[in-house]
Design a protein with these regions (language model features):
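Oxidoreductase cofactor-interface core, primarily capturing Rossmann-like NAD(P)-dependent enzymes
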Residues: 1-7, 17, 25, 31-193
Protein backbone atom coordinates (compact mmCIF):
# COMPACT_ATOMS: atom_id res chain seq x y z
CA UNK A 1 0.00 0.00 0.00
CA UNK A 2 1.41 3.37 -0.95
CA UNK A 3 0.28 6.84 0.07
CA UNK A 4 -0.74 9.30 -2.63
CA UNK A 5 1.76 11.74 -1.15
CA UNK A 6 5.34 11.36 0.00
CA UNK A 7 6.31 12.58 3.47
CA UNK A 8 7.30 15.93 1.94
CA UNK A 9 3.83 16.51 0.45
CA UNK A 10 4.83 15.80 -3.16
CA UNK A 11 3.01 13.19 -5.25
CA UNK A 12 4.24 9.63 -4.78
CA UNK A 13 5.29 8.20 -8.21
CA UNK A 14 4.55 4.60 -7.06
CA UNK A 15 0.96 5.32 -5.95
CA UNK A 16 -1.74 3.34 -7.78
CA UNK A 17 -5.38 4.24 -7.23
CA UNK A 18 -7.77 1.40 -6.32
CA UNK A 19 -8.49 -1.25 -3.74
CA UNK A 20 -5.79 -2.30 -1.32
CA UNK A 21 -5.27 -4.98 1.31
CA UNK A 22 -3.90 -4.58 4.78
CA UNK A 23 -3.06 -8.06 6.09
CA UNK A 24 -2.90 -8.50 9.87
CA UNK A 25 -0.94 -11.22 11.61
CA UNK A 26 -2.56 -10.57 15.00
CA UNK A 27 -4.62 -8.08 16.95
CA UNK A 28 -3.16 -6.90 20.22
CA UNK A 29 -3.35 -3.36 21.43
CA UNK A 30 -3.08 -1.99 24.92
CA UNK A 31 -3.90 -5.24 26.71
CA UNK A 32 -2.75 -5.08 30.29
CA UNK A 33 -1.17 -8.09 31.93
CA UNK A 34 -2.34 -10.59 32.97
CA UNK A 35 -4.44 -11.01 29.86
CA UNK A 36 -7.91 -12.47 30.22
CA UNK A 37 -9.70 -13.91 27.17
CA UNK A 38 -11.29 -11.47 24.74
CA UNK A 39 -13.08 -14.20 22.79
CA UNK A 40 -14.99 -17.17 24.21
CA UNK A 41 -15.92 -19.93 21.76
CA UNK A 42 -18.50 -22.51 22.81
CA UNK A 43 -17.96 -25.67 20.79
CA UNK A 44 -18.58 -29.39 20.91
CA UNK A 45 -16.87 -32.13 22.84
CA UNK A 46 -15.97 -34.83 20.32
CA UNK A 47 -14.74 -32.40 17.69
CA UNK A 48 -11.36 -34.13 17.24
CA UNK A 49 -12.62 -37.71 17.52
CA UNK A 50 -13.89 -38.54 14.00
CA UNK A 51 -10.34 -38.96 12.66
CA UNK A 52 -8.93 -40.63 15.77
CA UNK A 53 -7.38 -44.02 15.02
CA UNK A 54 -8.70 -47.02 16.95
CA UNK A 55 -11.78 -45.23 18.28
CA UNK A 56 -14.87 -47.41 18.82
CA UNK A 57 -17.51 -45.24 17.12
CA UNK A 58 -20.36 -47.30 18.59
CA UNK A 59 -19.51 -45.79 21.98
CA UNK A 60 -19.43 -42.20 20.71
CA UNK A 61 -22.16 -39.53 20.60
CA UNK A 62 -24.22 -39.30 17.38
CA UNK A 63 -22.35 -36.29 15.94
CA UNK A 64 -19.05 -38.20 16.16
CA UNK A 65 -20.51 -41.39 14.68
CA UNK A 66 -22.27 -39.50 11.88
CA UNK A 67 -19.65 -36.86 11.06
CA UNK A 68 -19.34 -38.07 7.45
CA UNK A 69 -23.12 -38.23 6.96
CA UNK A 70 -23.42 -34.73 8.44
CA UNK A 71 -21.04 -33.33 5.79
CA UNK A 72 -18.07 -33.46 8.18
CA UNK A 73 -19.58 -30.84 10.48
CA UNK A 74 -17.19 -31.59 13.36
CA UNK A 75 -14.17 -31.44 11.05
CA UNK A 76 -15.43 -28.09 9.70
CA UNK A 77 -15.95 -26.73 13.24
CA UNK A 78 -12.40 -27.74 14.14
CA UNK A 79 -10.59 -26.43 11.05
CA UNK A 80 -12.73 -23.36 10.26
CA UNK A 81 -13.56 -22.54 13.87
CA UNK A 82 -11.22 -23.58 16.64
CA UNK A 83 -7.99 -23.69 14.64
CA UNK A 84 -8.59 -20.21 13.17
CA UNK A 85 -9.34 -18.81 16.61
CA UNK A 86 -6.10 -20.25 17.99
CA UNK A 87 -4.12 -18.81 15.06
CA UNK A 88 -5.72 -15.35 15.30
CA UNK A 89 -3.57 -14.00 18.12
CA UNK A 90 -6.67 -12.88 20.03
CA UNK A 91 -6.69 -14.04 23.67
CA UNK A 92 -9.32 -16.81 23.64
CA UNK A 93 -10.95 -19.63 25.57
CA UNK A 94 -12.53 -22.61 23.82
CA UNK A 95 -15.22 -24.30 25.92
CA UNK A 96 -16.24 -27.68 24.50
CA UNK A 97 -19.49 -28.75 26.05
CA UNK A 98 -20.90 -32.22 26.30
CA UNK A 99 -24.65 -32.61 25.57
CA UNK A 100 -26.51 -29.45 26.60
CA UNK A 101 -29.55 -29.71 28.89
CA UNK A 102 -32.22 -27.40 30.25
CA UNK A 103 -31.37 -28.49 33.80
CA UNK A 104 -30.36 -25.81 36.32
CA UNK A 105 -26.74 -24.96 37.05
CA UNK A 106 -25.16 -26.25 40.22
CA UNK A 107 -24.16 -29.86 39.60
CA UNK A 108 -20.59 -30.87 40.35
CA UNK A 109 -18.45 -30.63 37.23
CA UNK A 110 -15.56 -32.33 35.51
CA UNK A 111 -13.21 -30.24 33.40
CA UNK A 112 -10.96 -32.23 31.07
CA UNK A 113 -8.62 -31.71 28.15
CA UNK A 114 -7.80 -33.92 25.20
CA UNK A 115 -11.38 -34.41 23.94
CA UNK A 116 -12.10 -37.71 25.68
CA UNK A 117 -15.20 -37.19 27.84
CA UNK A 118 -18.92 -37.60 27.17
CA UNK A 119 -21.84 -36.60 29.33
CA UNK A 120 -24.20 -33.69 29.82
CA UNK A 121 -24.11 -30.15 31.18
CA UNK A 122 -26.62 -27.41 31.85
CA UNK A 123 -26.80 -24.49 29.41
CA UNK A 124 -27.07 -22.21 32.43
CA UNK A 125 -23.80 -23.64 33.79
CA UNK A 126 -22.06 -23.13 30.43
CA UNK A 127 -23.14 -19.47 30.43
CA UNK A 128 -21.68 -19.03 33.92
CA UNK A 129 -18.43 -20.69 32.83
CA UNK A 130 -18.17 -18.32 29.84
CA UNK A 131 -18.71 -15.21 31.95
CA UNK A 132 -16.14 -16.40 34.49
CA UNK A 133 -13.63 -17.16 31.71
CA UNK A 134 -13.89 -13.59 30.38
CA UNK A 135 -12.57 -12.35 33.71
CA UNK A 136 -9.89 -15.00 34.30
CA UNK A 137 -6.32 -14.93 33.01
CA UNK A 138 -6.16 -18.63 33.97
CA UNK A 139 -8.66 -19.39 31.18
CA UNK A 140 -6.76 -17.52 28.47
CA UNK A 141 -5.36 -19.69 25.68
CA UNK A 142 -7.09 -22.81 26.99
CA UNK A 143 -9.24 -25.42 25.25
CA UNK A 144 -11.22 -27.74 27.50
CA UNK A 145 -14.24 -30.00 27.75
CA UNK A 146 -16.76 -29.80 30.57
CA UNK A 147 -19.60 -31.99 31.86
CA UNK A 148 -21.57 -32.55 35.03
CA UNK A 149 -21.01 -35.65 37.14
CA UNK A 150 -24.74 -36.46 36.93
CA UNK A 151 -25.44 -39.39 34.55
CA UNK A 152 -27.77 -38.93 31.56
CA UNK A 153 -30.32 -41.24 33.18
CA UNK A 154 -30.68 -38.97 36.24
CA UNK A 155 -32.20 -35.49 36.04
CA UNK A 156 -30.43 -32.82 38.06
CA UNK A 157 -32.64 -30.61 40.20
CA UNK A 158 -31.97 -27.89 42.73
CA UNK A 159 -33.78 -27.56 46.04
CA UNK A 160 -34.72 -23.86 46.26
CA UNK A 161 -34.45 -24.07 50.06
CA UNK A 162 -30.89 -25.41 49.82
CA UNK A 163 -29.27 -24.18 46.58
CA UNK A 164 -25.75 -25.31 45.70
CA UNK A 165 -22.93 -22.90 46.58
CA UNK A 166 -21.56 -20.58 43.91
CA UNK A 167 -18.58 -22.03 42.09
CA UNK A 168 -15.17 -20.43 41.84
CA UNK A 169 -14.38 -21.44 38.25
CA UNK A 170 -10.77 -20.31 38.69
CA UNK A 171 -10.30 -23.51 40.69
CA UNK A 172 -11.01 -25.39 37.45
CA UNK A 173 -9.21 -22.98 35.11
CA UNK A 174 -5.98 -23.21 37.14
CA UNK A 175 -5.77 -26.98 36.45
CA UNK A 176 -5.85 -26.51 32.66
CA UNK A 177 -2.73 -26.69 30.50
CA UNK A 178 -1.81 -24.56 27.48
CA UNK A 179 -1.69 -26.12 24.03
CA UNK A 180 -3.98 -29.11 24.61
CA UNK A 181 -6.39 -29.34 21.67
CA UNK A 182 -7.40 -32.99 21.60
CA UNK A 183 -5.51 -33.59 18.40
CA UNK A 184 -2.99 -35.31 20.60
CA UNK A 185 -4.28 -38.19 22.71
CA UNK A 186 -3.81 -37.69 26.41
CA UNK A 187 -3.49 -40.54 28.87
CA UNK A 188 -4.75 -39.12 32.13
CA UNK A 189 -7.77 -38.97 34.39
CA UNK A 190 -10.20 -36.04 34.23
CA UNK A 191 -9.90 -33.51 37.05
CA UNK A 192 -13.03 -33.47 39.23
CA UNK A 193 -13.26 -30.48 41.56
Amino acid sequence: MFSKFEFDGKLNPTFVEGAFKLPLSSIRAYLKEPISPRFIHVGSAGITRPDRAGLDLSKQPPAVRLNKELDFILTFKLKQGEDLIRESGIPYTIVRTCALTEEPAGANLIFDQGDNITGKISREEVAQICVAALESPYASGKTFEVKSVVPFSEPFTVDPQNPPPEKDYNVYFKTLKDGITGKEILEHDPVPV
